[in-house]
Amino acid sequence: DQSVRTWLGCHRRAFEWFGAVPARLIIDNAKCAITRACMHDPQVQRAYAECAEGYGFRIDACPPRDPQKKGIVEAGVKYVKGNFLPTRSFRNLADLNAQVREWVLKEAGLRIHGTTRVRPLDTFAVERSTLLALPEVPPDLGSWHAVTVHRDCHVSFERALYSVPFALVGKALWLRATDAVVTVYHDFKPVATHARARRPGERRTVSDHLPP
């Protein structure tokens, strides 16, 4: 799942686990992060730019077609797949998280790393002093989506419908969705705010949005 919502949520959970934020993140050109890869002027996904501003980190996109500039992350994924997953079963996601946390702290983080020749947890203990502090108030993370107002004065997002003022029928608007709230914008101004629907087919309607 490389949706923007999942991408941002993974960042939040990682930063909370570390208890701090790296000052610079090297990012491969996944669409949930970089909408246009470019050597000199990459286009950052709008919601991800807001995340970076809220946490204070800098986004450093990898140059396209230059594998030498990428962070060495694939090897870590391969290590987890080969050493953690094969011999285990999980009741649910919470059980998986509890098991992997114990594995990192008692096994994976204490091994001698094949490249650095240092235990990963020892490296992290040294690096932690260089990290940024978490913000006192976590940023309100949300994803942006282009929407068009239907003739019934609603916009559609993830198979749910949200009303906007009837004068905007036919207009192209922007919708920002957080885990709890959906806000619709016209000309950079909010025109409607709704609690986020939880079921496909739900309608969130404000009577004042409808024509008299």
Show where each model-derived region lies.
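Active-site-proximal acidic segments at structured loop/helix or strand boundaries
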Residues: 77-176
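Two-metal-ion acidic nuclease core segments, chiefly of the RNase H-like superfamily
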Residues: 41-59
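Protein C-terminal end segments and domain termini
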Residues: 179-212
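A short, flexible beta-alpha/helix-coil linker loop
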Residues: 29-34
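Active-site beta-loop-alpha junctions of metal-dependent nucleic acid enzymes
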Residues: 1-21, 198-204
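Extended, hydrophobic alpha-helical segments in both membrane/secreted and soluble proteins
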Residues: 7-11, 26, 48, 59
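RNase H-like two-metal-ion nuclease catalytic core shared by retroviral integrases
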Residues: 27, 38-39, 57-81, 94-96, ...
